[in-house]
């Protein structure tokens, strides 16, 4: 199936959803050689991935993942595709912690760095979390403390053969898109940053096909896979079975423009320190971008009616110290239940 798929893709022909599902199934079964998988990934990158292809791949990965069943009505994820070249600190990881302090339940799905210096797993480990906690512990963390981390290799075990190929290619591939689309938890809301402006609407279409109730798929005018504060941001919102495309500007929320260099991160240790400083109330451009993205998480989490309310709530959580308290609670709870 892989060879046939590559032949189609080389001719710039799209796979349908069923074909894509079968191709991913073959990869996960371990039958795909590194050269075939690499050829498929590069071919898709050059052609451009279709909605049907991404949906089929995502459904196959979800069906073959270790499922995390939760006793919670509404759970969200906050993540980006990566591959934007922005080299920012781990914004969505900070957002997940703050959103949980507001009462939103967050199943943060992520991995170690592949095409960046610091993935969500890297920075969470530096913050003191056991990123390889068994699913039963992560389930308790989400249900009791509002946030847990789902380390992708623990849940997508069949993908272990793909990671070395991704690292060797050293460029973004369809797997940058699939990571955020294959959360093993039953999430219903999502803030998803993408590396290309032309992906916001197609990825919103995929989310609809995957059963997401409310989402914001975002891409900054500056290229970031976040809601940026250096410029406006493109948004494709999923709400009540429809997709709405619009642009938001940080100035609309009384957040000043920042400079790209103000948002840069470094390695996991430095990024962890940045997150701690923000949670402790430090002000500045880094806090501003976290606040705006937290507002989006609170909105897709159905805790606020709009982003303006979300910004106000995020500011209160940081100013009051509640966000930092929640971070310590989550960390302490994980250590207690695992020990």
Swiss-Prot record:
Any keyword Metal-binding?
yes
Q: Which residues bind Mg(2+) 2?
A: 225-226
Subunit description = Homodimer.
Q: What are the protein's GO molecular function terms?
A: anthranilate phosphoribosyltransferase activity; magnesium ion binding
Enzyme class, first EC level, given as a word: transferase
Task: Please provide the record's keywords in A-Z order.
Answer: Amino-acid biosynthesis, Aromatic amino acid biosynthesis, Glycosyltransferase, Magnesium, Metal-binding, Transferase, Tryptophan biosynthesis
Which Gene3D superfamilies does the UniProt record give? Nucleoside phosphorylase/phosphoribosyltransferase catalytic domain, Transferase, Pyrimidine Nucleoside Phosphorylase, Chain C
Q: Which cofactor does it need?
A: Mg(2+)
Offer one example of a GO biological process linked to this entry.
Answer: L-tryptophan biosynthetic process
Q: What is this protein's function per UniProt? A: Catalyzes the transfer of the phosphoribosyl group of 5-phosphorylribose-1-pyrophosphate (PRPP) to anthranilate to yield N-(5'-phosphoribosyl)-anthranilate (PRA).
Which residues are noted in the entry as anthranilate 2-binding?
Answer: 166
Annotated Mg(2+) 1 binding sites: 92, 226
Which family does the record assign? Answer: Belongs to the anthranilate phosphoribosyltransferase family.
Annotated binding of anthranilate 1, by residue: 80, 111
| Binding locations of 5-phospho-alpha-D-ribose 1-diphosphate | 80, 83-84, 88, 90-93, 108-116, 120
Say which domain of life the source belongs to. Answer: Bacteria
Q: In which pathway does it act?
A: Amino-acid biosynthesis; L-tryptophan biosynthesis; L-tryptophan from chorismate: step 2/5
One term under GO cellular component: cytosol
Spell out the HAMAP family in the cross-references.
TrpD (MF_00211)
Reactions performed catalytically: N-(5-phospho-beta-D-ribosyl)anthranilate + diphosphate = 5-phospho-alpha-D-ribose 1-diphosphate + anthranilate
Q: How is this protein named in the record?
A: Anthranilate phosphoribosyltransferase
Q: How is the cofactor bound?
A: Binds 2 magnesium ions per monomer.
């Amino acid at each position: 199936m892989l060879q046939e798929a590559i032949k189609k893709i080389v001719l710039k022909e799209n796979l349908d959803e069923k074909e894509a599902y079968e191709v991913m199934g073959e990869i996960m079964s371990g039958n795909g050689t590194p050269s075939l998988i690499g050829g498929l990934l590069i071919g898709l990158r050059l052609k451009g991935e279709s909605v049907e292809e991404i949906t089929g791949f995502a459904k196959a990965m979800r069906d073959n993942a270790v499922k995390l069943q939760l006793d919670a009505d509404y759970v969200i994820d906050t993540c980006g595709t990566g591959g934007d070249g922005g080299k920012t600190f781990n914004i969505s990881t900070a957002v997940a912690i703050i959103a949980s302090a507001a009462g939103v339940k967050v199943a943060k799905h992520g991995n170690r760095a592949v095409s960046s210096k610091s993935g969500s797993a890297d920075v969470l480990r530096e913050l003191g979390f056991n990123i390889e906690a068994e699913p039963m512990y992560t389930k308790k963390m989400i249900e009791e403390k509002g946030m847990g981390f789902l380390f992708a290799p623990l849940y997508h075990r069949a993908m272990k053969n793909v990671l070395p190929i991704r690292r060797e290619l050293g460029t973004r591939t369809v797997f940058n898109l699939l990571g955020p689309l294959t959360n093993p938890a039953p999430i219903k809301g999502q803030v998803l940053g993408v590396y290309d402006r032309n992906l916001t609407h197609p990825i919103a279409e995929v989310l609809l096909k995957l059963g997401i109730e409310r989402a914001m798929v975002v891409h900054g005018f500056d290229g970031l896979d976040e809601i940026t504060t250096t410029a406006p941001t493109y948004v494709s919102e999923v709400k009540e079975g429809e997709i709405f495309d619009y642009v938001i500007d940080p100035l609309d929320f009384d957040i000043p423009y920042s400079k790209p260099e103000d948002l840069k991160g470094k390695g996991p240790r430095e990024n962890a320190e940045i997150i701690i400083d923000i949670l402790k109330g430090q002000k500045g451009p880094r806090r501003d971008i976290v606040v705006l993205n937290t507002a989006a998480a609170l909105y897709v989490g159905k805790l606020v009616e709009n982003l303006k309310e979300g910004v106000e709530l995020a500011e209160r959580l940081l100013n009051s110290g509640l966000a930092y308290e929640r971070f310590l609670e989550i960390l302490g709870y994980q250590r207690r239940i695992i020990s």
